[in-house]
Regions:
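Bacterial N-terminal signal peptides that target proteins for export
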Residues: 1-12
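C-terminal segment of classical bacterial N-terminal signal peptides
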Residues: 16-25
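Extracellular/periplasmic carbohydrate-active domains that bind, remodel
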Residues: 24-427
Length: 427
């Protein structure tokens, strides 16, 4: 199949990105069963060497091949995927992260010191991870450690935690059917990657710190489809760059998120670290159930850039704390009243050309909060057929908003509060 990215074409509620290279099905090649290479799969023996040997030998030739992981629990330290391979996880097969923290070598990732991810690729292409099995980061070891450090009050003793699956400067990637859960930190991370499909996945780690489900970072041409996620942080977080980034930073762009269900977590976020910008994101037919946020676009003066051509369609939210949250004051309290403008810099967030259509939210804490900067207000925000119910209503400041068939019901206070710094046009 081909999934196209590049030119946005609207067609009966669908968005197609034209020009994206097809994600290849792996050609017939070697089949390397990890047990043939000595893996035990008994839940106790460390099988890292055997699994990595299967990967290395299966990809040694030009044709590549399939690494088979049969039913069993395989304890592994970090493994590295290679070009032209399929990692097939059979039903009841689990790759389980080693509980030994010393198994995770220190590395620099995204300009920061950290440790190796459990499963990763670097400068690779044509990789598929599929099947009905599980990649389990065994994250409770890391979460308990971090909670203990944070509760100790001792500064400077935090320990970097391993991510689950990272595609670093890699392309033509497909993940389908598997479960990724309990990573020490972020769970699935395309980093400066291109042409990726994540379909029919379950990503799980509720009530755990910083366990974002899927975090595209300065990556392009991505499909996230039929994903169920329940995590301890963002269900999806689209990023590019970092706080006070020295640059240069590539944008994240050409991303579609369709037919997904998100439960615990912080919803779909763009930001907050977006020094490279984010463009061409389309979200359609997504359900949020009990998340902290639903639709969230967030940044601040020290980490922003251009965020544009963002659309949401056919979105339902139930019992979400904040249904729609757009802020250019992230990590600070949103201002009350007018605040002084500051000079526009390379890192000033610039949110514009954002559309939300056919959006409903019931049982929310806050229906919506939309706050731009005085020097860079939110521009071109269009709400069409949007119906929100919350304990409190919608507030708008430093923004220009067009509303077409919008209703807001608030248990207390004004349903829609428009600050003098904002302009609302009703059709």
């Amino acid at each position: 199949m081909k999934i196209a990215v590049g030119v946005r074409l609207a067609a009966v509620g669908a968005v197609i990105w034209a020009g994206m290279a097809s994600v290849p099905a792996m050609a017939a090649g070697k089949v390397c069963d990890v047990k043939t290479y000595g893996a035990k799969g008994d839940g106790t023996t460390k099988d890292t060497i055997a699994v990595q040997k299967a990967i290395d030998e299966c990809t040694a030739g030009k044709g590549g091949g399939t690494v088979e992981v049969p039913a069993g629990t395989y304890v592994i330290a970090p493994i590295v995927l290679k070009s032209n391979m399929t990692l097939h996880l059979a039903k009841d097969a689990t790759l389980l992260g080693s509980p030994d923290m010393t198994d995770y070598s220190k590395v620099v990732f995204a300009r920061h010191p950290t440790v190796q991810p459990l499963v990763g690729s670097v400068n690779a292409e044509n990789i598929t991870i599929n099947g009905e099995g599980t990649i389990d980061g065994n994250g409770h070891i890391w979460w308990d450690y971090v909670r203990g450090v944070r509760n100790s009050g001792v500064l400077g003793t935090d320990h970097p935690r391993p991510m689950g699956v990272v595609f670093d400067h890699s392309k033509h990637i497909r993940m389908e059917g598997v479960t990724v859960q309990n990573s020490g930190f972020w769970q699935i991370v395309p980093y400066y990657a291109d042409d990726l499909v994540f379909r029919n996945l379950r990503v799980l780690a509720p009530l755990s710190p910083n366990t974002d489900a899927i975090d595209p970072f300065s990556s392009s041409n991505i499909v996230i489809d039929h994903v169920f996620a329940s995590t301890g942080d963002d269900n999806v977080a689209i990023k590019s760059g970092e706080i006070n980034s020295p640059g240069p930073d590539d944008p994240s762009k050409n991303i579609t998120i369709t037919d997904c269900t998100f439960e615990r977590g912080h919803g779909i976020s763009i930001g907050s670290e977006i020094a490279g910008g984010v463009q061409n994101v389309h979200v359609e037919r997504v359900s949020f159930k009990g998340t902290d946020n639903g639709i969230r676009i967030k940044s601040a003066r020290d980490r922003g850039n251009d965020v544009s051509n963002i659309s949401y369609k056919d979105i339902t939210m139930e019992n979400v704390k904040i249904a729609i949250y757009i802020t250019e004051f992230y990590a600070s309290k949103d201002p009350e009243g007018e605040v002084p403008a500051e000079p526009v810099t390379r890192l000033t967030p610039k949110f514009h050309d954002i559309t939300m259509e056919n959006v409903t939210a019931t049982g929310s804490g806050v229906a919506a909060s939309i706050v731009g900067l005085p020097e860079s207000p939110v521009l071109g925000l269009t709400l069409k057929n949007v119906h929100l119910e919350g304990k409190t209503g919608m507030s708008i400041a430093y923004a220009k908003v067009t509303m077409d068939n919008v209703t807001v019901k608030a248990d207390t206070g004004e349903a829609i509060k428009v600050a003098p710094t904002a302009t609302v046009t009703r059709k």
